Amino acid sequence: DLHRVDRRQRQMCIRDRFMTWGESHGEGLGVVVDGCPAGISLCEEDIQKFLNRRKPGQSKYTTPRKEDDRVSILSGVFEGKTTGTPISMVVYNKTQRSADYSEIAGYYRPGHADYTFDEKYGFRDYRGGGRSSGRETIGRVAAGAIAVKILEELGINVCAYSSRIGGINIDYNNFDLKECDNNAFNMPDSNAAMQVEKYADGKLKEQDSMGGIIECVVTGMMAGVGDPVFEKLDANLAKAIMSIGAVKGFEIGDGFAAADSTGSTNNDSFTIKDGRIVKKTNHSGG
């Protein structure tokens, strides 16, 4: 019964720590995951299926750089199971073209970390953004794949999708997660995806880009994970998401819309359902 899960299982959800490393045009990028419990079934294919979803060059709307992004597990796994020791994984860069970036060595790109890297370190790797490249997320995805394995054992499921791109919102009446695999924008609404495709084609011609919103939903999560103040679960989630390059906002539940609400309508009341304490609403996002 996940609702009577013991303290060790609760802590197992949050004790993993990871550190990413590598640069966009270096030999490779990777991650070290520390704190993973022993005995979890894990192989490279468990990681690869998630990396295949994020690898570049899969549509005309992403970077034209093409990489296989094949992962190798270097440590922490023996005979198909985690050993409880740090898990190290690496993806080697294969098609980096550093000469393409020689022109920007002497100036700063807007919306990038070029200027701040120079200010902080007095030196920067200008090739593809170096450490600040979007390829840094390779390590996050690999670590997340391990987290998925752990969470699945506890009956916890995580899904994410694009809910808004270029000012175009999905219609929740047309919501179908299977549609995410049928369009280049990971949108669960085929009509919205078609509108975004038309909009994106226009931005391609203008040599411009566009922003969007990603929603993430977690089901099966037990109560009581996290700490009361500085290690609040929502605080740690916000820090994790805001550390991703280009992310400029984070909401849980109704988020900023709660500012226009009242306590009587925003606060989630409790009730009893099937012998369990549950909330009548979910404005707080769990």
What residues fall within each predicted segment?
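Single conserved hydrophobic/aromatic residue that forms the stacking wall/gate
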Residues: D1-R10, I14
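Glycine-rich anion/phosphate-binding loop at the beta-strand->alpha-helix junction
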Residues: T20-W21, E27, Q207-G286
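Alpha/propeptide regions of enzymes that mature by internal proteolysis
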Residues: S24, G28, G39-Y61, E136-T137, ...
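Glycine-rich, N-terminal phosphate-binding loop and its surrounding beta-alpha-beta segment
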Residues: L51-P110, D114
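Structural signal for hydrophobic packing residues in well-ordered secondary-structure cores
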Residues: L51-S59, T95-R97, E119, I150-V158, ...
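A structural-propensity feature for long, helix-poor, extended segments
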Residues: G57-G76, N169-N173, E179-N191, E197-L204, ...
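Glycine-rich, mobile lid/loop segments that gate access to catalytic sites or pores
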Residues: E119-V229
